[in-house]
Amino acid sequence: MAKRIVITGIGVLASNGSGKEAFWGALKEGRSGIKDVSLFDTSNMRTKKAGEIKDFDAASFLGPKGLRLLDRSTKLVNVAAKLALDDAHFKVTEENTHDTGVVLGTTLGSIWSISEFDKTALIEGPRYVNPALFPNTVINSPASQISIRFVIKGFNTTIATGFTSSLDALKYARDFLEWDRAKAILVGGVEELCLQTYLGFYKL
């Protein structure tokens, strides 16, 4: 008989609603999250709208500590993780931390951080890059920062399989629970809206 695996908490940040109640309400009412972009200049582009999360303030959810060097993608996923943990009433303890895992799906990772870091290295020279910002350029940085912030000491995996990354992460997590590799898993996906991702789709 297959093991019963359940979802106990949900954390969501989306352009049409942050928090599961707001997001579900928007879906039921058919409210779109597509708005004018404010994160970067679109004046020279034909398209000026996207699904942007407006007025995002990670500190209001997480407090100011440890946020200064994190990029937007990592902040988004840490807030979503906190919302999910709170919704599940799940507290990571010394007793369960090694049996708790993290699986995160992403298509492009922290593409803004990668681009900005490389731009500085190419234009100004490698010695002018800020080494403190380098961790943001690694694709598994957001997932790793979840484990660091919430002291999760079980396995930590980033799935990058294109547009199915988050679904693949969910399947990966389900398998690990089925195989008794973990008792609880924080699983999700993240993509940030930035100029680089916008241009990628704009050029299609």
Segment roles from a protein language model:
Residues 22, 26, 73-80, 139, ...:
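Generic hydrophobic secondary-structure packing signal
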Residues 1-66:
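ACP-dependent fatty acid/polyketide chain-elongation machinery
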